[in-house]
Amino acid sequence: MKRLYSSVAVLLLSIMVSACATQSNAPMAGKEIPKSWIDPDTGHKIVRLSEEPGSRSLYFHQNSYAASGDKMVISVDNPKGVAVIDLKTLEVKRLYDDPNIGILFMGPVSRDVYLTYIPAVDGEVVHPQNELQTPTKVLAVNIDTGAVREVATIARGKIHSINNDETLLIGAFAQEAHNLETGPRDKRFEARYEAKDAEGNPLSFADAKEVRMDERLEKRIPMQMFTVNIQNGEQKTILKSTDWLNHIQFSPHDPELVMYSHEGPWHKVDRIWLTDIHGRTPQKIHSRMMNMEIAGHEFWSFDGKEIFYDLQTPRGQDFWLASYNLETGERVWRHMERDEWSVHFNMSRDGKLFAGDGGDSEMVAKAKNGKWIYLFDSVPVKDVAGISARNAKDLIKPATLKSTKLVNMQNHDYRLEPNITFTPDGKWLVFRSNMHGPVHVYAVEIAKH
């Protein structure tokens, strides 16, 4: 495995040394988008991994990498489908085309990528959501052979995650339809949220999203969380609730442990919860201590021992990357500056490095200079002169995040979330961006030369 990861790094470096020049991350106005370049503001090398406009990497906690680390999957457009990137050669191959499919994730054990198939309605693409009241077919496609098999059909709702031994899928459905979005999506962006203030003025994208989410939360639509047996398609309900169940993630270590969220405006909900496939009493992971405190965009460490999340005390004022250790109960809060807040955070597989994808001035941090891809080191705040409080081990452990800017995202429109992920070897960050106009998938090298 180490040899494979090393070969990926060497190949990426050799391609960029031969082809890269210092260029700006600016819209190309009809010109060809460069295959590789050095960001003039950070000195880090960037590679465009995708070949086709409209290509996207997956959501930040959805696995896009084969277990062996040699390939990753992305979505492609025109025609809509799935492509595979060989991380040894950087060759991109279309794997499966269909206008009605979407990518869920790579299997953690097999060489299969899991897809959804949802028929279009009146010529419009139907996006997976918990409130969907029509069937979704789940397919598995082998990334080497292209062999396709049907896994299951769910009558309604959405599949969210797959467990680490690849025996179960998990999803949720609401008992009535509701659409957060107000019309067809612009392909350059993430979603379409529109709302007006009390005077009838259009709200910003970020504020409109809050309004639309609050409308959905207050409907208190009955929901169910369910598992799907990958071998035989059997479905089993594990949780019923009128809370808005969302962001469901199996533990990467325990095939029965499940993290999920109570969705809605973060300051109104206790968001992060644990349960299991047997429906054990849910455990709340973070308790609010002040009004307007928010926590969310939670994700697992790769060893499954910790849960990480964006914490703000209060919202939009003080920013932390927090974690909770399931084995020891230890909590760590890592402080960051306003401009370093990111839409999503992620971590390397060895747990040594963190990354963030930045944000624009309309988002919660109201950052003045936040449009960057960041690398973070966590630096603990140590006791003074080695003197500890008697109950130090029972207290939250403070730390700070030391940031390094990797990519200037000034020309990126954050209505498309970059969704950064570390490559399995920990040497690159993969993200999606519309910085040059069309959406493409890019990788930035963490090492600086």
Model regions and ranges:
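Blade/loop signatures of beta-propeller domains
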Residues: 24-47, 214-226, 388-397
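Beta-strand-rich domains and repeat architectures in extracellular enzymes and scaffolds
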Residues: 25-36, 45-80, 248
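Conserved beta-propeller blade repeats
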Residues: 55-73, 98-119, 155-174, 202, ...
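Asp-box/WD-like beta-propeller blade repeats and closely related beta-sheet repeat scaffolds
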Residues: 100-101, 107, 116-223, 237-240
